Amino acid sequence: MSAEGYQYRALYDYKKEREEDIDLHLGDILTVNKGSLVALGFSDGQEARPEDIGWLNGYNETTGERGDFPGTYVEYIGRKRISPPTPKPRPPRPLPVAPGSSKTEADTEQPVLTLPDLAEQFAPPDVAPPLLIKLLEAIEKKGLECSTLYRTQSSSNPAELRQLLDCDPPSVDLDVFDEHVLADAFKRYLADLPNPVIPVAVYNEMMSLAQEVPSSEDYIQLLKKLIRSPNIPHQYWLTLQYLLKHFFKLSQASSKNLLNARALSEIFSHVLFRFPAASSDNTEHLIKAVELLISAEWSERQPAPALPPKPPKPTSIANNSMNNNMSLQDAEWYWGDISREEVNEKLRDTADGTFLVRDASTKMHGDYTLTLRKGGNNKLIKIFHRDGKYGFSDPLTFNSVVELINHYRNESLAQYNPKLDVKLLYPVSKYQQDQVVKEDNIEAVGKKLHEYNTQFQEKSREYDRLYEEYTRTSQEIQMKRTAIEAFNDTIKIFEEQCHPQERYSKDYIEKFKREGNEKEIQRIMHNHDKLKSRISEIIDSRRRLEEDLKKQAAEYREIDKRMNSIKPDLIQLRKTRDQYLMWLTQKGVRQKKLNEWLGNENTEDQYSLVDDDEDLPHHDEKTWNVGSSNRNKAENLLRGKRDGTFLVRESSKQGCYACSVVVDGEVKHCVINKTATGYGFAEPYNLYSSLKELVLHYQHTSLVQHNDSLNVTLAYPVYAQQRR
């Protein structure tokens, strides 16, 4: 048995973002069952415009995966007869039975039963039927963020659903059912009502209103008035209101469940109206009516803001956040030069409006990045700096980053971008981070440092091995895809040769038969068989290569999955290790001892092994502090010096200093922050009471922990060599 479907070709690579998605690679062929599009309310002809459909569910013939993929990433090829999938099929949404029509085959086996009329199921002050309330509460509890809710049919048969609906509401335990069974039971409930929630009696008047009233707001008010007519029991209006509240809650989570007002109206309009067969125009009017009702519910019920995470200690907004004269380094929400991965970790599972600021990854002087939580995702906003002014876009009007942030703590960012209708509510404070180190003596902390460093090194080696395998597999897959394309071209050429040869061979065989030339007939047959055999060999080779490619693609996805699972552990282990290392450094532990715990064998730096560092030139600030010098002068002073030669100067960034150091024969520059907690290169390392203390620490500690390109210590003060 086969069904009708559509074929699409991937135009771009797509890496899946959700569990139900599938990966796409350029050129992949995908098949979508026609029934799945019909179930979502799409009509014939729309399949040719996948970008208008949005997300499609189908089968990737290249990789053998089934799941969702974006319509904007594919192009339509044509129709195809397909076999329905055998493992856990995803059937199209069943259509409701129109009044007066015969039941489906599945339903003929069941007794024709309906629920009591809504007017008989409850009465005010109740707001809806008890069973309906219990069903929707369970669905909202379990499946509010489920991306397949109301789109995927459960495995329960009609008899089981009917049995669930016939239960006594107070006694039934809905926790034993998953969200898809509950969703099917809800749909079955609406379908089994003797009359639809929006009565048939208002259908004709409603269609007239749709054509006569152009204003959406006026139409909604008249539609509500129509449904609340004295001729219709009040329970119908109360039930509709309760359903709209449910749809409103679902649409609030549409970034995760994909159920916006339009999608919900397409799914439920037919069962809310349950009208006789109508034209497509009328159907669209009814879908639009439900969409407007849900949207009106949205506008009438603005959601309360999410509660912020409770901070360890209260912070006074008046004293802290709203002080425009505060230095940027002292702002609790400014984290300096931290990575995007660390930002994502700090903002994970936080409320909308949570934010922090870091240095821009472009490293342009004075540019920063605001990361803001909105709609469950992180939004990155560039803060530009030009001519002493700051802002998100031209014209730049704020005198400082602090003033900019304070402004948007009171005003919505919708002023800047209409899609960012949120304020900067909850700063991620660098002063309120959890204390990682729990041990209370140096030896115990050192042992823990050794354990975490060992785990970090093992994870790093595993990640590096997987990355090499990932790169190699990616290259091999690309080569095999190229080879398959070459096979396809070759087969096409041979087949083009085969067709005319068959025609000519047939003519010549007839001719030689008449002449009795058996030898020529045998030669023609032999050549024809040889060509056919060659085509078969090429097709077999292509098939084997396609099987290899399919296996390797599965391996490739598995490697990628393992890499993604390791990466968060790697980041967390590094952060924990660095916290222990920082704690020991603050306690004055010597680098030699730290190297033992870290397992560092390279301890040949002439300063790192000196037991008594009193003779170090670093103690004399005049050997490295050059005062108000600029970048060009610093580079001239350090040009030609050996790696590790350094100086410290005042930075063009107000209130900060800059360290210039020779690395791999080049002069590099990095900012030294001056904050309320001390000097340092980045949070949470701004803890040195003076520049001298910072220089002495990094005399034996590499700067690589702050910047991968700075694998060097502050070994040689620029003027120390001249004084020897």
UniProtKB/Swiss-Prot annotation:
Key words of the record: Acetylation, GTPase activation, Phosphoprotein, Protein transport, Repeat, SH2 domain, SH3 domain, Stress response, Transport, Ubl conjugation
SH3 domain span: 3-79
A Gene Ontology molecular function term of the record: protein kinase binding
Residue ranges occupied by any SH2 domain in the UniProt entry: 333-428, 624-718
Tissues where this protein is expressed: The P85-alpha isoform is widely expressed. Expression of the P55-alpha isoform is highest in brain and skeletal muscle. The P50-alpha isoform is abundant in liver with lower levels in brain and muscle.
Region (Disordered): 80-109
InterPro entries, per the entry: ISH2_PIK3R1, PI3K_P85_iSH2, PI3K_p85alpha_SH3, PI3kinase_P85_cSH2, PI3kinase_P85_nSH2, Rho_GTPase_activation_prot, RhoGAP_dom, SH2
Location of Phosphotyrosine modifications: Y467, Y580
Residues annotated with N-acetylserine modification: S2
Site (Arginine finger) residue list: R151
Chain intervals with Pro residues compositional bias: 84-97
GO CC, alphabetical: cell-cell junction; cis-Golgi network; cytoplasm; cytosol; membrane; nucleus; perinuclear endoplasmic reticulum membrane; perinuclear region of cytoplasm
Positions of post-translational Phosphoserine modification: S154, S279, S608
A biological process from GO: intracellular glucose homeostasis
Annotated ranges, domain Rho-GAP: 113-301
Post-translational modifications reported in the UniProt record: Polyubiquitinated in T-cells by CBLB; which does not promote proteasomal degradation but impairs association with CD28 and CD3Z upon T-cell activation.
Function, as annotated: Binds to activated (phosphorylated) protein-Tyr kinases, through its SH2 domain, and acts as an adapter, mediating the association of the p110 catalytic unit to the plasma membrane. Necessary for the insulin-stimulated increase in glucose uptake and glycogen synthesis in insulin-sensitive tissues. Plays an important role in signaling in response to FGFR1, FGFR2, FGFR3, FGFR4, KITLG/SCF, KIT, PDGFRA and PDGFRB. Likewise, plays a role in ITGB2 signaling.
Family: Belongs to the PI3K p85 subunit family.
Domain notes for this protein: The SH3 domain mediates the binding to CBLB.
Oligomeric and partner information: Heterodimer of a regulatory subunit PIK3R1 and a p110 catalytic subunit (PIK3CA, PIK3CB or PIK3CD). Interacts (via SH2 domains) with CCDC88A/GIV (tyrosine-phosphorylated form); the interaction enables recruitment of PIK3R1 to the EGFR receptor, enhancing PI3K activity and cell migration. Interacts with phosphorylated LAT, LAX1, TRAT1 and LIME1 upon TCR and/or activation. Interacts with phosphorylated TOM1L1. Interacts with CBLB. The SH2 domains interact with the YTHM motif of phosphorylated INSR in vitro. Also interacts with tyrosine-phosphorylated IGF1R in vitro.
Name of the protein in question: Phosphatidylinositol 3-kinase regulatory subunit alpha
Gene name as annotated: Pik3r1
